[in-house]
Amino acid sequence: MADLLIELFSEEIPARMQAKAEADLLAALTGKLKEAGLAWKTAFAVSGPRRLTAVVEGLDARSADVREEKKGPKVGAPEQAIAGFLRGAGLTDISEASVVSDPKKGDFYVAYSTVPGRDAKDVIAEAVPAIIRDFHWPKSMRWGTGELRWVRPLQRIVCVLDGAVVPFEVGGITSGNETEGHRVHGRGPYTVTGWADYKSQLEGQGHVVLSRDDRRAAILGGIEKACAKAGLQWIEDKGLLEEVTGLAEWPVVVLGQMDPDFLDLPPEVITLSMRTHQKYFAATHAKTGKLAPNFILVANIAATDGGAKIAEGNARVLSARLSDARFFWEKDKATPLEVMGEKLKTIAFKEELGSLGDKVERVAALARELAPAVGADPGLAERAARLAKADLVSEMVGEFPELQGVMGRYYALAVGEDARVADAIRDHYKPQGPSDSVPTDPVSIAVALADKLDTLVGFWAIDEKPTGSKDPFALRRAALGVVRINLENGVRLKLSNAILKAPLAVRPVVKGGQSDSVRSAASKAIDALIDPTLLSFFADRLKQVLRDQGKRHDLIDAVFALGEDDLVLIVKRVEALAAFLATEDGATLLAGYRRAANILKAEEKKGALPDGLSVDPALIAKGPAAEQALWASLNETTAALEAPLKTEDFAGAMTALAGLRAPVDAFFEDVLVNDSDAKVRENRLALLIAVRGALHKVADFSRIEG
């Protein structure tokens, strides 16, 4: 057994690429070893700003010999067949082959050969250069006059097997056993013999924390210690934490202080400026929760003054950044949102759907239409929609696109707009992902729904729907947003009605003398709206939401098939249906339904089911008791369903359906549907149709699986 250490040492690797490169290196190396027939006990990899390291412990020193056999022709086969076999097997005479007997096939020739194993050293010397040459980076470069590509110039390659260098050369770099430590604290070089020695020297004299997990833990510990001492609470940012973990080999947390005067800027501006430009964490006062005039940086050096000069220098840089932000803030506040909004007319949204200004007009009209249904003031909803996109042309959003909507809210509040209007400007983009919250104020709900529905209807009108994994206009996210907004707020809105209001908002675009393509899209809007694929698209998103909650997708189909598109109502029906089917009555009635449905399906397939069949009570009265009992129960159930369905008492509706269970069972037990009397047969089929129809008042049971 042998131990292998490989290090690929380069200039700085972008932080975002390190984790994947670490995994890719390990996968490529173990893949090559496995392919060569070598086994090992453990294998792992680590990565950092300047190195990718892979370790394999307990590696076979040599792969096993492999015995191969090549089957040949039968004994006594023609000379031509035997000659071909000898050439293929590398034999000079047939006497070198073995004869194997098979009870069915008879005697035939077999050539055996042994492929000798290979030393691990030889396999590695061949595999590692190939891995380096074929390694995939999202972005790579060449340097000097060489042809080798790497993410940044590759400087050293360590390849040590059981303390000895595995010699090879790739891209002009010869493998060796020397590496470097921290640029300032322990550059080295260091001669290493294996993983234990490598780790000991680098994490000791070399001042390099090799593991990402260890660096992350060191950073978290440093942040918590610094904040506890200063009475602060850091604003957690997992994305930034991962990034700075990949920026420092020897992470040292430094707490800095900025000019408190900058706190008059919106906190989102300050924290985003820190994060985007400087990779700093922000902090709040632990007692008040308000943003503190502090920043937390992760240095790659342990300064002798405790980081005071580092903090001072970074404070100056941050001050310059925030001064720029203050300039944008003051300039934007001097421009009314209505004036900003005028510029949207010159910005294309989609050629066939006009400008962003056109979209704003449509959304404003649609928000007014939807407002009563969600309990919002129509005037406020329209006002918010007209201002919602204005900040897209602001200086601040130009610098920080992530602040779209957020800055619009601040600018609206600064001039005295209604707080509900301001909040809707910020929240109409929500939810922007599965973990994002949905708007909850009625005005925000109206504008958010209008914005998303306008986008969906527009792209359906121009036939640009998502296909496969491609969704360049984030239509799935928009539809999912509509679903979540409705469900999480209990909004009672029929999607078909809401969608059909969209053309009312599209028509003003046509009146505005827009291009032929815009008029064409508007004229197609009605057809697009009644396209069943749009409602099906929403159904798929609803399934996604409910599936994440552990609910069955087939029950959603069963309810949606009735033409129901009030999402809140669908969920209530699905929950009641799931509870009913979990009972013995529900499961048995479903089995009875399927039996009836199969009989009817077979008759329909044969064309033996006349149109307009209806039950003749007189014939029922002459039939068996079980038939009469089912007819009576069906009438009772149909009557009993009316009240609970009208009041949306779906549990009550299921209770009413349960009354059919025993009569349906008895009917199939005692009654022959396919009676010799044609009229009796048709009447019994009509009875089954009536049973099916009663169940379909609650859900399409044919869509239920299992």
Curated annotation (Swiss-Prot):
Q: Give the first-level EC class, as a single word.
A: ligase
Q: Which reaction does it catalyse?
A: tRNA(Gly) + glycine + ATP = glycyl-tRNA(Gly) + AMP + diphosphate
Gene name on record? glyS
Major subcellular location class: cytoplasm
Q: Name one GO molecular function term.
A: arginine-tRNA ligase activity
Q: What is this protein called?
A: Glycine--tRNA ligase beta subunit
CC annotations in GO: cytosol
The source organism is Hyphomonas neptunium (strain ATCC 15444)
Q: Which family does it belong to?
A: Belongs to the class-II aminoacyl-tRNA synthetase family.
A GO biological-process term: arginyl-tRNA aminoacylation
Q: Which UniProt keywords apply?
A: Aminoacyl-tRNA synthetase, ATP-binding, Cytoplasm, Ligase, Nucleotide-binding, Protein biosynthesis
Q: How does it assemble?
A: Tetramer of two alpha and two beta subunits.
Where found, per UniProt?
A: Cytoplasm
What Enzyme Commission number does this protein have? 6.1.1.14
Q: Which Pfam families match?
A: DALR_1, tRNA_synt_2f
